[in-house]
């Protein structure tokens, strides 16, 4: 399988998806036809989100079609060489994808050679479930099971920092809560600016920041760019 799972879409001082464009270009391998899954978009319309994505990827020769615009979404997925899943609210993304019957077809198409690109919520969707999203559950997705393309759970935008005087839980504490009720899981705290690239059977960590791996009953382990999962 070919996956590009990004923690986020924007870095300080850079344009939207700018840091991801070289990664995408290097993983296209001649692929040009993409479907975009915009359902995580809440404060922007799906048309706006699709057009924004298409404009950014056009210089790479990628032709982007919004899945909500086609008469036969299943046929569009089957024909797609690239499946792109944008960030936003993970619960809405999963709900809309499930209700349209897109989850199994997307997973099957990626397993048969389509490149999967997802940032934030899109990275969450590639995991076995969306249980490590940071998002508010604004809708009921009728279950948390997702695409299960990547075997570990990703927590995007990971940071353990708290504002001065803030008394709420750290991100690690929240992850530890999950591991109490689901000790079989492994959670990757993927900070902004980092990504996981899967190609030729190898999953490799990239990005400038330290990534953390959490397992039940164990201390967190720090990983740097180049680590192979």
Curated annotation (Swiss-Prot):
It catalyses: Dipeptidase E catalyzes the hydrolysis of dipeptides Asp-|-Xaa. It does not act on peptides with N-terminal Glu, Asn or Gln, nor does it cleave isoaspartyl peptides. Its EC number is 3.4.13.21. InterPro entries: Class_I_gatase-like, Peptidase_S51, Peptidase_S51_dipeptidase-E. It comes from the Bacteria. It holds the Pfam family Peptidase_S51. Keywords: Cytoplasm, Dipeptidase, Hydrolase, Protease, Serine protease. GO terms for biological process: proteolysis. Gene3D superfamilies: 3.40.50.880. Transmembrane segments: none annotated. It is an enzyme of class 3 (hydrolase). The active site is at residues 120, 135, 157. It is found in: Cytoplasm. One of its GO terms (cellular component) is cytoplasm. PANTHER family: ALPHA-ASPARTYL DIPEPTIDASE (PTHR20842:SF0), PROTEASE S51 ALPHA-ASPARTYL DIPEPTIDASE (PTHR20842). Belongs to the peptidase S51 family. Hydrolyzes dipeptides containing N-terminal aspartate residues. May play a role in allowing the cell to use peptide aspartate to spare carbon otherwise required for the synthesis of the aspartate family of amino acids. This is Peptidase E. The gene is pepE.
């Amino acid at each position: 399988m070919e996956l590009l799972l990004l923690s986020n879409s924007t870095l300080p001082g850079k344009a939207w998806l700018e840091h991801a464009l070289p990664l995408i270009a290097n993983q296209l391998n001649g692929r040009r036809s993409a479907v975009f899954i915009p359902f995580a978009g809440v404060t922007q319309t799906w048309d706006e989100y699709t057009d924004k994505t298409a404009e950014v990827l056009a210089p790479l020769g990628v032709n982007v079609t919004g899945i909500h615009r086609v008469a036969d979404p299943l046929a569009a997925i089957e024909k797609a060489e690239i499946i792109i899943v944008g960030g936003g609210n993970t619960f809405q993304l999963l709900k809309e994808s499930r209700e349209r019957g897109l989850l199994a077809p997307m997973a099957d198409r990626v397993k048969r050679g389509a490149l999967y690109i997802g940032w934030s919520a899109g990275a969450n969707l590639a995991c076995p479930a969306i249980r490590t999203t940071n998002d508010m559950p604004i809708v009921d997705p009728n279950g948390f099971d997702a695409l299960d393309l990547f075997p570990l759970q990703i927590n995007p935008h990971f940071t353990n920092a708290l504002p001065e005087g803030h008394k709420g839980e750290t991100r690690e504490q929240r992850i530890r809560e999950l591991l109490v009720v689901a000790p079989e899981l492994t959670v990757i705290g993927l900070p902004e600016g980092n990504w996981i690239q899967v190609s030729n059977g190898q999953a490799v960590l990239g990005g400038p920041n330290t990534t953390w791996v959490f397992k039940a009953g164990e201390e967190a382990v720090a990983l740097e760019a180049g680590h192979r999962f």
